[in-house]
């Protein structure tokens, strides 16, 4: 490990194993672009406040931009002997601009520096993930628009319950995605707060202008308390919670695709573009994409639980434990982005619904039983009485190996005299679905209206995409 800015206080060098354990350069290098931007803004603020000369600030900013260029072209790759990204950048800066490079850290601590870097990084990642969500939502909207009148069994307890429009089913996931976008947008507001200038924990005696730095970096507000500013990782937890919910929603859809692609359901087939085979069984076509998305969900949950556990016992202010915030959030963001991208491709070109199988599926069960009860309700029969009547009818059908449509009207009247020939039209799957026309229901008119509202919301979130 090379000498560090704090080594003057110590007589003995750090044990190599401890140095390696202490170092974060192996993962916090991901923050380098944001560290460079934050440092450049800090240098400009120091000159603006009269702490550095304009010439000194220009030298610092020029050196930082040189490091950025070297990083992007692969010329600058800090080794593992560096403690962290901040020291690696500072050391290279001194090599490039000389002694003035040592002035960059004036009125700044790594504590407020890393908080600034992480917020800048997360702000950009949130924007990227919201963009990915937008593309995913667009794919679901387009798919749903093609299947307003395609019927599919609806389930509760994984038992067939009532038939629904396939578009209505897909709209449920669009609603989940809408909440995900709203959550991330709200979290971004709390991320977009500048802690730079808080120092190690107590601020600084130098006449800095924190508002100036915040404006340069695009922050909309300043942190109000220096102790809280350097130790706050609420925004990390919030992001990990939001990422976990996105993963939950993708995992639920993945589970359904896995089920629907199975021989037991056969509601859809997987295309060759989004499936894999078996190394042993030549007939297999495996749903690897949704399985991996489902698997990554547990890993994202783990990062959330890990961060909560790190924070639960920390006294104010900064503690080294907070170094553990980065690997989890970096991995969670990557996992969510890759899952959204893969699921978008899967929904766009990886599945083909089987309309004949779906049409048959809604005809072969008792999912129209509730509508038979509603038929009696419309005839003036109390619902609880109607419920009992239809329960008895279903029990009779099960013993007779018949469906509701198979019973002659005379048998229906044996159970209740209010039944008439118009019953059969009332319990066909298409009639059953179309009749559920309450707001938010699966009736075709309601589904078309819901698609219109979802489309309007999508265009509100992504106006530039809507223009193309």
UniProtKB/Swiss-Prot annotation:
Species of origin: Gloeobacter violaceus (strain ATCC 29082 / PCC 7421)
Q: Where in the cell is it found?
A: Cytoplasm
Q: Which InterPro entries match?
A: Arg_succ_lyase_C, Argininosuccinate_lyase, Fumarase/histidase_N, Fumarate_lyase_CS, Fumarate_lyase_fam, Fumarate_lyase_N, L-Aspartase-like
What UniProt keywords apply to this chain's record, in alphabetical order? Amino-acid biosynthesis, Arginine biosynthesis, Cytoplasm, Lyase
| CDD domains named in the record | Argininosuccinate_lyase (cd01359)
From which domain of life does this come? Answer: Bacteria
What protein is this chain from? Answer: Argininosuccinate lyase
Q: Which reaction does it catalyse?
A: 2-(N(omega)-L-arginino)succinate = fumarate + L-arginine
Q: Which PROSITE patterns match?
A: FUMARATE_LYASES
Listed GO CC annotations: cytosol
PANTHER family under this entry? Answer: ARGININOSUCCINATE LYASE (PTHR43814:SF1)
Q: Name one Pfam family in it.
A: Lyase_1
**An annotated Gene Ontology molecular function:** argininosuccinate lyase activity
In which family does this protein belong, per the annotation?
Belongs to the lyase 1 family. Argininosuccinate lyase subfamily.
Report the principal subcellular site: cytoplasm
HAMAP family in the cross-refs: Arg_succ_lyase
Q: What is its EC number?
A: 4.3.2.1
Please state what class of enzyme this protein is. Answer: lyase
């Amino acid at each position: 490990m090379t000498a560090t800015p704090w080594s003057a206080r110590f007589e003995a060098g750090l044990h190599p194993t401890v140095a390696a354990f202490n170092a974060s350069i192996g993962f916090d290098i991901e923050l380098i672009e944001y560290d460079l931007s934050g440092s450049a803004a800090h240098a400009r603020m120091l000159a603006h406040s009269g702490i550095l000369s304009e010439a000194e600030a220009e030298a610092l900013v020029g050196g930082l931009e040189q490091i950025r260029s070297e990083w992007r072209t692969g010329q600058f790759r800090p080794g593992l002997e560096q403690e962290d990204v901040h020291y690696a950048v500072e050391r290279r800066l001194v090599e490039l601009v000389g002694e003035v490079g040592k002035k960059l850290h004036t009125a700044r601590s790594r504590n407020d520096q890393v908080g600034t870097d992480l917020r800048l990084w997360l702000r950009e990642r949130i924007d990227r993930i919201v963009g990915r969500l937008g593309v995913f939502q667009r794919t679901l909207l387009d798919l749903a628009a093609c299947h307003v009148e395609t019927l599919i069994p609806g389930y509760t307890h994984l038992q067939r319950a009532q038939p629904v429009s396939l578009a209505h089913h897909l709209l449920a996931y669009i609603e989940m995605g809408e909440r995900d976008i709203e959550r991330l947008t709200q979290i971004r507001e709390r991320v977009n707060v500048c802690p730079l200038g808080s120092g190690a924990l107590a601020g600084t005696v130098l006449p800095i202008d924190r508002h100036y730095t915040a404006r340069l970096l695009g922050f909309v507000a300043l942190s109000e308390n220096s102790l809280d500013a350097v130790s706050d990782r609420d925004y990390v937890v919030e992001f990990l919670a939001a990422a976990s919910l996105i993963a939950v929603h993708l995992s639920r859809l993945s589970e359904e695709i896995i089920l629907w692609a199975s021989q037991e359901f056969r509601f859809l087939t997987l295309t060759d573009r989004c499936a894999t085979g078996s190394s042993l069984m030549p007939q297999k076509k495996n749903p690897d994409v949704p399985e991996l998305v489902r698997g990554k969900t547990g890993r994202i949950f783990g990062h959330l639980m890990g961060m909560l556990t790190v924070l639960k016992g920390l006294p104010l202010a900064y503690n080294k434990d907070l170094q553990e915030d980065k690997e989890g959030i970096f991995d969670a963001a990557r996992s969510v982005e890759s899952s959204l991208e893969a699921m978008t491709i899967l929904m766009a070109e990886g599945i083909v619904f089987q309309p004949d199988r779906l049409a048959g599926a809604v005809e072969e069960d008792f999912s129209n039983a509730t509508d038979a009860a509603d038929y009696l309700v419309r005839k003036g029969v109390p619902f609880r009485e109607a419920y009992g009547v239809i329960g008895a009818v279903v029990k009779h059908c099960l013993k007779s190996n018949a469906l509701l449509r198979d019973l002659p009207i005379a048998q229906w009247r044996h159970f209740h005299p209010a039944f008439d020939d118009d019953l059969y039209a009332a319990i066909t799957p298409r009639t059953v679905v179309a009749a559920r026309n309450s707001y938010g229901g699966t009736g075709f008119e309601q589904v078309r209206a819901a698609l219109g509202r979802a489309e309007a919301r999508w265009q509100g979130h992504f106006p530039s995409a809507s223009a193309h």
